[in-house]
A protein has these predicted regions:
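Glycine-rich phosphate/diphosphate-binding loop of Rossmann-like nucleotide-binding domains
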Residues: 1, 104-176, 188
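A short beta-strand-loop structural module common to alpha/beta enzyme folds
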Residues: 2-15
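Generic secondary-structure signature for well-ordered alpha-helical cores
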Residues: 3, 33-36, 58-66, 93, ...
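Glycine-rich phosphate/nucleotide-binding loop
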Residues: 13-16, 25, 181-281
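N-terminal glycine-rich phosphate/adenylate-binding segment common to multiple enzyme folds
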Residues: 17-112, 197
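Short, glycine-/small-residue-rich phosphate/pyrophosphate-handling segment
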Residues: 73-99, 113-118, 233-266
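Short, amphipathic C-terminal "tail helix"
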Residues: 286-304
């Protein structure tokens, strides 16, 4: 037992279809009051409809840093054996600010909003994380060769902040070149810090390097609020069928336990997940098994 008392609230497209609103009343107030939340995957319509709940939560609570650890796991089929990197994604700005409008019937415009305070805040977060967790290098991800003002500001701010951390190696990589290098030799990277859009894209790419989104947890971190979740989406094609791999949300919960100071419980939960996957029995279909979500979760729980 963790000693955590839970309050549960519904959210997402299915809830909205029935109730006309994205979040059950009281959810935002509860997050505001407690400052900690574990969030399940929610669907967002493509090309129309309401804005992403994730984006709204991040902007409402100013959870400016999205922390996404990526590492190779024993028992998970992958092309790479020694991946161990962390993505630090700026969570509140860039094209994900959601500022879009029609100039006329044939021209749509989206605003890429980048501010120096947000750039400095996320870069400093990345270096502080590296220093606190024994990481040796931080790489800035950008396209400053083309977007000289927006990404240029991100890169120049990164270089300014890096001067305050002489013990940590700092370099940068253009986003398209980074994608190539990640699929060639991912072990060359340690901590990647990126604006919102690039961070989102490389998060999924890196998850693919270690076996897929089923093993990708994340934490949305602000000054007063932390929201933990799986990187993957709601997978509507298997929703309600008891087929999904719950590892990512369990690993996100382990991140939460660790940040709450329950480091022993976090380590035990992570070890139980890894042991279950490595054994290869009672695992879900995405990694070659036949177990249901419930069966996998029960097997992990039995190891605790």
């Amino acid at each position: 037992a963790t000693g955590i008392e839970w309050e549960e609230y519904a959210a997402g497209a299915e809830y909205a279809a029935e109730h006309g609103e994205l979040l059950q009343p009281g959810a935002l107030d509860a997050i505001e009051e407690y400052g900690w939340a574990l969030k399940g995957p929610t669907a967002t319509p493509i090309g129309k409809g309401f804005r992403s709940i994730n984006v709204q939560l991040r902007q409402r609570f100013n959870t400016y840093a999205n922390l996404r650890p990526v590492r190779t796991l024993p028992g998970v089929p992958t092309r790479f054996e020694n991946v161990d990197l962390v993505i630090v994604r700026e969570n509140t700005e860039d094209l994900y600010k959601g500022i879009e409008y029609m100039l006329n019937d044939e021209i749509a415009n989206g605003v890429k909003l980048i501010t120096k305070p947000a750039c400095e805040r996320i870069c400093r977060f990345a270096f502080d994380y590296a220093a606190a967790n024994g990481r040796k290098k931080v790489t800035a991800v950008h396209k400053a060769n083309i977007m000289k003002l927006t990404d240029g500001m991100f890169l120049s701010t990164f270089r300014e902040v890096a001067k305050d951390y002489p013990a940590i190696e700092a370099d940068d990589c253009i986003i398209d070149a980074l994608c190539m290098k990640l699929v060639q030799k991912p072990e060359q990277f340690d901590v990647l810090v990126a604006p919102n859009l690039y961070g989102d894209i490389i998060s999924d790419l890196c998850a693919g390097l270690v076996g897929g989104l089923g093993f990708a947890p994340s934490a949305n971190i602000g000054a007063k609020t932390r929201i933990y979740e799986a990187v993957h989406g709601s997978a509507p094609d298997i929703a309600g069928q008891n087929k999904a791999n719950p590892s990512a949300i369990l690993m996100a919960f382990a991140m939460m336990l660790n940040d709450l100071g329950m480091t022993d419980k976090a380590a035990r939960l992570n070890a139980a997940i890894l042991a279950q996957v490595a054994e290869g029995k009672a695992v879900t279909a995405d990694i070659g098994g036949t177990a249901t979500t419930t069966e996998f979760t029960d097997a992990v729980a039995a190891r605790l």
